[in-house]
Amino acid sequence: MTTTMKTFVAFVLTVFFIMSSAHCRTTTGGSPGYGIGGRTKTCFTPALCIYRGVHGCDSYCKTKNFDYGYCRQEHCCCVNY
């Protein structure tokens, strides 16, 4: 009985340790850039550039909290500084 209880407690503590280390990882994506990292570009495949042109792509990107958008072939690319 004690071996099973010790194994169970060790298992629970191991799971808690793994979960806490997985949730506590820091990311650099939300840190302020101050122009050091340059700009980030994300391209989407909706047909905005085909049907609505550059203006449609730009307004789509601004609703997604990007700085601006431009068309590259049929893709709409959004840019953040």
Swiss-Prot record:
Keywords: Antimicrobial, Disulfide bond, Fungicide, Plant defense, Secreted, Signal. The keyword Secreted applies. Disulfide bonds join C43-C78, C49-C71, C57-C76, C61-C77. Coiled coil: none annotated. One of its GO terms (cellular component) is extracellular region. It is found in: Secreted. Residues 1-24 form the signal peptide. GO terms for biological process: defense response to fungus; killing of cells of another organism. The keyword Manganese does not apply. Belongs to the DEFL family. This is Putative defensin-like protein 102. It comes from Arabidopsis thaliana (Mouse-ear cress). The lineage of its organism: Eukaryota, Viridiplantae, Streptophyta, Embryophyta, Tracheophyta.
